[in-house]
Amino acid sequence: MRVALGVEYNGARYSGWQRQSHVNSVQQEVETALSRICNHPVAIVCAGRTDAGVHGTGQVVHFDTDAPRDMVAFTLGMNTLLPKDIAIRFAQPVADDFHARFSATARRYRYVIYNNPLRGAVLNEGVTHFHHTLDETKMQEACQYLIGKYDFTSFRAIHCQANTAIRTIQHLSVQRQGSYVIIDIKANAFLHHMVRNITGCLMDIGLHKQQPVWLKELLDLKERAKASATAKAAGLYLVDVDYPEQFNIPKTPLGPLFLPDISI
């Protein structure tokens, strides 16, 4: 039996999603709990591997098991075993040809900036604090230049191992809700650090260090060194993964926290 799980996690105390030797990872915690539920070793495959400090409200994984278990064992049962900063949001039997990574048609991220002169005392693990005022109108104006199919070499990590930098951004927007500035981005797939590098550039535009059209110039340059510094991990969330309807993967509230669901 193949099962898909929806996973939510606060990545602050983890060295990323992927299991690694001698460090704490989200994958390790989920696999350990699943192995106890199934009474055999379980390996999971995720939709997208997030970096150290990055969070998830819409991560999707799959695993195989022959253990006769009701789905409630993989939701309520798992949540009794997992640490409080990881939770299962749904469990769903799926077809054998479903693959959490390769069946995905799009991923969606949100980046949350607490834009206030003074730092806050709550939620500080889940947002990036930035004390200079950001012009979200200019940031939103810049978004148009990245929507579409382009070579995103200027926005990939130097050590990114992807074979091609061609990606298609389907949606990119910037909104302000009080002291919070939210960047919402959806693409067929992302390069390593792509969202955080785009965020860093948008923040410089929000500071009026660059004009919105600068993003188009960066696309044409195809040179990472010409772009802004990578934004911090703390404000980034994987909030949704799209799959073909045939797999019937449940949709859960995007979040994080107070942010409304917006169909795009």
From Swiss-Prot:
Active site: 51 (nucleophile)
The UniProt record lists the keyword Glycoprotein: no
SUPFAM superfamilies reported for this sequence: Pseudouridine synthase
Gene Ontology molecular function: RNA binding; tRNA pseudouridine(38-40) synthase activity
Keyword Nucleotide-binding: no
Catalyzed reactions: uridine(38/39/40) in tRNA = pseudouridine(38/39/40) in tRNA
Keywords associated with the record: Isomerase, tRNA processing
Name of the top EC class for this enzyme: isomerase
Record-listed substrate binding positions: 109
GO biological process, one term: tRNA pseudouridine synthesis
Annotated EC: 5.4.99.12
NCBIfam families, sorted: hisT_truA
Quaternary data: Homodimer.
Physiological role: Formation of pseudouridine at positions 38, 39 and 40 in the anticodon stem and loop of transfer RNAs.
Family membership noted in the UniProt record: Belongs to the tRNA pseudouridine synthase TruA family.
Name of the protein described by the UniProt record: tRNA pseudouridine synthase A
Lineage: Bacteria, Pseudomonadati, Pseudomonadota, Gammaproteobacteria, Alteromonadales
